[in-house]
Amino acid sequence: MNYTIEKIDENNYSLFDDMVFWREHGNEREPSQTEVSEQMKNELLNPDLYVYAVKVDGRYVGWISCVYIAKIGSRWNGHGHIYVDELWVEPSYRGNGFAKALLKKADELKNELNAMGIRLYVNVNNPIAQKLYEACGYVEDGRAIFMEK
């Protein structure tokens, strides 16, 4: 299956938002050309935010959202980590290597930014995702308790 991976910016955000709608509601909507809000434009201009989407037949079918967090101190020498915040592929498109391609994009970003590594969190109740990450070279490096406020 032919596909491309595109960085999301204000020019293609409407198409990306259509995919987010698809994920949230379980059905596609007509492509929207709604204007991108100033708040979203500012978010997309964040130099440490990287969002990439897989495009197949003119629509996005998956994405990865990454953020770069710098580390200070002599141990890190100013180099931080890439954190994968979210990785999703529409269920009917899974099994085509898109998630691996998106994770490869995170690897490329790590090299481009000279980051120390890539970190991500995976739910212990999501063994399919765990196997994907292991197949892409990720290893379990401890357990954590996830807390939010």
Which residue stretches match the model-derived regions?
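Conserved GNAT acetyl-CoA-binding A-motif
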Residues: 110-122
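Active-site/acyl-donor-binding loops of N-acyltransferases
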Residues: 143-149
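Conserved active-site alpha-helix within GNAT-family acetyltransferase domains
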Residues: 100, 124-143
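Conserved beta-strand segments that form the floor/walls of ligand-binding pockets within enzyme
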Residues: 53, 83, 88, 119-121, ...
